[in-house]
Design a protein with these regions (language model features):
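The catalytic Tyr-centered alpha-helix of NAD(P)H-dependent dehydrogenases
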Residues: 132, 143-150, 180, 184-188, ...
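N-terminal Rossmann-like NAD(P)+-binding domain of SDR-like oxidoreductases, especially those catalyzing
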Residues: 1-177, 307-311, 317, 321-329
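Short aromatic-enriched loop/helix-cap "lid" or pocket-rim segments at secondary-structure transitions
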Residues: 41-44, 127-131, 182-185, 216, ...
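C-terminal substrate-binding subdomain of Rossmann-fold SDR/epimerase-dehydratase oxidoreductases
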Residues: 56, 73, 195-331
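Hydrophobic alpha-helix immediately C-terminal to the catalytic Tyr-X-X-X-Lys motif of short-chain
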Residues: 153, 157, 161, 191, ...
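Residues in well-ordered alpha-helical elements
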Residues: 62-65, 84, 91, 102, ...
Length: 331
């Protein structure tokens, strides 16, 4: 299969490229990435001789059309994704997550190419902490941040292009990912690298907010399954059913790194911070017979800590800038 992977130098996209190269060596992989601060050429060093990297913007219609015409399928990871950045400056999120997705859709429509669109559970808003409900494919959209609103907009465009133009597309909405190559602005790698650089870890508010954690490799194996077996026009929710509150995750991480479990600072909470995300992945499990392999969160977290310990040359160049940005925001 000739795959075009947008955002393939970012966290989830780079891991998808690595797994594709190793598990599907017959595939040819082209990565389209603008290499903004969160997309890094170094994330593809281990597979650079097995892929083609094209540096460009997904809103460049001519470039996108050319690359899509050479492909059998597009896996669309490219997105601006950090909520704090969206609250401070939403324009890049509209540019990439909405206009970029429109550009991809027009290209796959023109050339008749299969598309899988990667999205987030944040489009559904949040749940109360003690609410037994979980998100399903039929939960109404209720985004609560500029980031999730732009991702919801992209999802709606995909659905409209499927119905109006017969585009062969699927959508997946996934819960919070963790694993290698995640930018140090994100919750888990920020805390790991704070410890490794002698900084105190930081926790928004009380830390009661709940996230549904999944290892990035499990997310990507589900994406591959949907790409190959998913029903056109269908949305699938991806989850390893790993709900944990942020305080518990931080304390677990600190203990694994030899620190006292309360050796961190509480900082000002994010405006409108979503309380709880929880996904019901029953459709994916029952229809496509997918299941996660990394079901032991503590083991996955320990492996992630080990990866950051062993790959300081990857994260160290961006760490100081990320923390300076957090200082500006008072977090």
């Amino acid at each position: 299969m000739r795959l075009l992977v947008t955002g393939g130098a970012g966290f989830i996209g780079a891991n998808f490229v690595h797994s594709t190269v190793h598990e599907y060596p017959e595939d040819s992989v082209t990565v389209l990435d603008s290499l903004t601060y969160a997309g890094r050429r170094e994330s593809l060093d281990g597979v650079k001789d097995a892929i083609r990297l094209v540096v460009g913007d997904i809103t460049d219609a001519e470039l996108v059309s050319q690359l899509v015409a050479e492909s059998d399928a597009v896996v669309h990871f490219a997105a601006e994704s950090h909520v704090d950045n969206a609250l401070d400056d939403p324009e890049p999120f509209l540019h990439t997550n909405v206009i970029g997705t429109f550009t991809i859709l027009e290209a796959v429509r023109r050339h008749g190419v299969r598309l899988h669109h990667i999205s987030t559970d944040e489009v559904y808003g949040d749940l109360e902490l003690n609410d037994p409900k979980r998100f399903t494919e039929w939960t109404p959209y209720n985004p609560s941040s500029p980031y999730s609103a732009t991702k919801a907009g992209g999802d709606m465009l995909v659905r409209a292009w499927v119905r109006s133009y017969g585009v062969r597309a699927t959508i997946s909405n996934c819960s919070n990912n963790y694993g290698p190559y995640q930018h140090v602005e994100k919750f888990i790698p920020r805390q790991i690298t704070n410890v490794l650089t002698g900084r105190r870890p930081k926790l928004y508010g009380s830390g009661a907010n709940v996230r549904d954690w999944i290892h990035v490799d499990d997310h990507n194996s589900a994406v591959r399954r949907i790409l190959e077996k998913g029903r056109i026009g269908q949305t699938y929710l991806i989850s390893a059913e790993g709900e944990r509150d942020n305080l518990t995750v931080l304390r677990t991480l600190l203990q694994m790194m030899g620190r006292e479990p309360d050796d961190f600072d509480h900082v000002t909470d994010r405006v409108g911070h979503d309380l709880r995300y929880a996904i019901d992945p029953s459709l994916l499990y029952s229809e496509l017979y997918w299941a996660p392999k990394h079901t032991d969160f503590e083991e996955g977290l320990r492996d992630t800590i080990d990866w950051y310990r062993a790959n300081e040359s990857w994260w160290r160049p961006v760490k100081d800038a990320a923390e300076a940005r957090y200082q500006q925001l008072g977090r």
